[in-house]
Amino acid sequence: MKLEGKIALVTGTSPNIMGGIAEGLAEEGADLVCIDINPDYAEQCAQSVIAKGRKAISIACDVTDETQVTAAVARAKESFGGVDILVNGATLFNTKGILEMSVEEWRRQTDVLLTGAFLFTKLVAKQMIELGRHGNMINIISTAGHQGEPGNIGYGTAKGGLLHFTRAVAMDLAEYGIRVNSLTPTATDRAEGLERAQRWGVKWPGPRLGQRLPGWPADPGAGLPMQKLPSPSHYGKAAAFLASDEAEMITGFDLRVDGGAISKYWIWDPGS
């Protein structure tokens, strides 16, 4: 297993993308600190990791609150001795365009996506340096952070900012042997998230593809070169690779698990 003996702290552990990543890290041998503002999501994520034979704790935390983040990072150290892997995935969906979004909504959404990553990255990095750990950090982006998407101004802007944050932090922390990368998912098949929510015993409606934003096709997967949408387990495997020694010379890099979405020439319709 790639991550045997490693401790991973994962934020935003809903049953979909981040739940899949948390379970993927556990399957490669990591023990988990599962964090979400929804205590049921955090706890059921931890229980799913324990069911796989690993250790896990859950922490309910607002990632924008420095006091709560400080306490969460301290508890990870108390419980496991420290953190080896940080995955910043906490998010907030609010699908509005520039003409509809209020400044309060803008601040809250960008605060969750950017400030949350800033706080966890800063505090976990300080802990890693204090403990002499050559750790790994992964920020979860989105194809919306690479491309313009109508009706999603706060999310896309924050994800784009997080992409550059990754590169900048990678340079700041390289001298300490801490690698920092990002992982870009795209529109994701809902089946696995729904199955995981049922298995966890929690409610997760998730964004319905084709209904979330104006102009989406009925079958978004048909527009990808791979002709299908990825699932959270695909992201989990990619995150495990980035966090492993197999990626020891990779930092400041964005790994796109998007079925070729970003690389595709815009006018080509693979499904036609």
Predicted ranges, named:
Residues 30-45:
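Conserved glycine-rich Rossmann-like NAD(P)H-binding loop of the short-chain dehydrogenase/reductase
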